[in-house]
């Protein structure tokens, strides 16, 4: 069974990323990492996260580069691409998944209600630093895993793990599943 780790809004926080990678590798055994943008830089409106180290964050991500699919966030710049050994400049990416489609984007450009998505498709986004788990009228599930390093809601860092049956929201500090959502209900 394929397992995706879904991570957003790292903002260069090496300590949070190191913890997430440890959990993803050793507890959840992730096959692939879906990065939803805002990878290295915190941007002018965010505070600098505790543990901020863009160089170390790059090294950690480059160590799994063959298993990363990423999209650009509003704080990501072309110069960030020079630090990373996998593409991060696409505004969106689409992945076939269990007869449906995963549409991944950062969340500042695309409106899931106007995209050509169908019932059962999964719209993954970040950007708001707030967890979102909602099914639109057209049957598309919108999911935001929150922020790894600068969370707003909930107040702790989160990421998600996704397999063929469900998507689970994980508390970065405790490794506990705080939300589990079946995909096909």
Regions found by a protein language model. Give the residues of each.
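Anion-binding (especially nucleotide phosphate/pyrophosphate-binding) glycine-rich loop
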Residues: 181-185
């Amino acid at each position: 069974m394929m397992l995706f780790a879904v991570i957003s809004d790292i903002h260069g926080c090496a300590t949070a990323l190191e913890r997430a990678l440890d959990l993803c590798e050793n507890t959840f055994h992730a096959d692939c990492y879906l990065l939803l943008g805002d990878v290295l830089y915190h941007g002018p409106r965010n505070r600098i996260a505790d543990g901020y180290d863009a160089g170390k964050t790059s090294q950690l991500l480059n160590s799994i580069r063959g298993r990363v699919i990423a999209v650009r966030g509003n704080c990501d710049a072309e110069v960030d691409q020079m630090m990373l050994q996998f593409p991060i400049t696409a505004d969106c990416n689409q992945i076939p998944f269990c007869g449906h489609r995963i549409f991944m984007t950062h969340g500042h450009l695309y409106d899931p209600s106007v995209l050509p998505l169908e019932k059962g498709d999964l719209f993954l986004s970040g950007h708001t630093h707030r967890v979102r788990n909602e099914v639109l009228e057209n049957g598309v599930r919108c999911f935001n895993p929150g922020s790894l390093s600068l969370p707003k809601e909930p107040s702790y860092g989160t990421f998600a793990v996704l397999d063929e049956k469900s998507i689970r929201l994980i508390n970065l500090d405790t490794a506990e599943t705080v939300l589990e959502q079946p995909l096909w209900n």
